[in-house]
């Protein structure tokens, strides 16, 4: 069963499902997503410094936010891509999560926005993620010590972008120490046992995600492209070591497990973590489900140890 603190939300979702995204405007959905994310996240961790900035990538500029924790060890910079089904999300929706992870890991976090659908369809978000990874790798001294480890992280849709960017740049000598994939979505047509069991009533409605994939892909019809469906990569040799976090009652659970297995198949070191009794998006629900904070702390502990070992 789901965690007792989550039961009221799951029951409510089953009794009164969220309106189908086609019935609301994109701006309305984004505003609602932002308001709800900030509300359920709760109080923010204080930081030594929070610096809003921009990353110029030739023909486009992306908003960024650097989080510097009070006990920053200067050993790593975590580049973070937010979730939101490729349609929603921004620096505000994941501000509290980045702050807590920065505090718990003693690492700097750099959250970066990317172009969203439907205004910008595939491969705009992927191009942004890849270009941001390359830019930050080349300019890491602007954000942290030049010799610091670089980690690429994301949740949900952001985890898909983190996975793709890590895979596509794996032979470019960027010095990416790790990729951290938090309940990743890994394709528009992935069918698994968990996608059947938890397709509806567990806070992520699978048909809503499928709808957003259609918004994201636009006229792009090749779903076997690994940039769309990372599970289709035919070689991941040399990809950065990975931490993959999945939630027990998430329709995306099994595809996250499958991607961890695919990475391992190609010789990549993987730590697979499963959050029991949890649902998709639980990491951002600290205000109402305090048990989620323990999982955030556990993830941070794994990441901190991961970096310590990689630097020795």
Which ranges hold each PLM region?
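Short beta-strand element of the alpha/beta-hydrolase
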Residues: 74-84
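A glycine/proline-hinged amphipathic helix-loop "lid/cap" segment
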Residues: 1-69, 308-312
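Active-site glycine-rich loops that stabilize anionic/oxyanionic intermediates
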Residues: 82-88, 249
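Short amphipathic alpha-helix adjacent to the substrate-entry channel of hydrolases
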Residues: 92-111
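Glycine-rich nucleophile elbow surrounding the catalytic serine of serine-hydrolase chemistry
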Residues: 154-164
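Alpha/beta hydrolase fold serine-hydrolase catalytic domain that processes acyl esters and thioesters
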Residues: 148, 163-312
């Amino acid at each position: 069963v789901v965690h007792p603190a989550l039961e009221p939300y799951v029951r409510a979702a089953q009794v009164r499902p969220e309106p189908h995204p086609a019935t609301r405007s994109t701006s309305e959905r984004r505003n609602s997503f932002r308001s709800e994310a900030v509300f359920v996240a709760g109080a923010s961790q204080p930081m030594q410094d929070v610096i809003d900035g921009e990353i110029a990538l030739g023909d486009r500029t992306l908003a960024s936010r650097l989080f510097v924790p009070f006990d920053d060890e200067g050993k790593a910079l975590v580049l973070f891509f937010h979730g939101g089904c490729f349609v929603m999300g921004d620096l505000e929706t994941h501000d509290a999560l980045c702050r807590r992870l920065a505090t718990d890991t003693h690492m700097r976090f750099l959250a970066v926005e990317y172009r969203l659908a439907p205004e910008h369809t595939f491969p705009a978000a992927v191009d942004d993620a890849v270009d941001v990874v390359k830019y930050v790798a080349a300019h890491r001294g602007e954000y942290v010590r030049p010799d610091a480890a670089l980690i690429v992280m994301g949740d949900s849709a952001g985890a898909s972008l983190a996975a793709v960017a890590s895979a596509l740049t794996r032979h470019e000598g960027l010095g990416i120490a790790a990729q951290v994939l938090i309940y990743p979505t890994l394709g528009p047509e992935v069918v698994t046992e968990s996608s059947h069991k938890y397709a509806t009533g567990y806070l992520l409605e699978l048909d809503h995600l499928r709808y957003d994939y259609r918004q994201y892909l636009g006229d792009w019809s090749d779903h076997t492209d690994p940039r769309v469906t990372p599970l289709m990569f035919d070689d991941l040799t040399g990809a950065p070591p990975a931490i993959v976090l999945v939630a027990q009652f998430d329709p995306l659970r099994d595809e996250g497990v499958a991607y961890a297995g695919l990475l391992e198949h190609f010789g990549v070191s993987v730590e697979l973590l499963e959050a029991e009794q949890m649902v998709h998006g639980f990491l951002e629900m600290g205000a109402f489900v305090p048990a989620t904070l323990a999982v955030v702390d556990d993830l941070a502990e794994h990441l901190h140890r991961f970096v310590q070992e990689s630097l020795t």
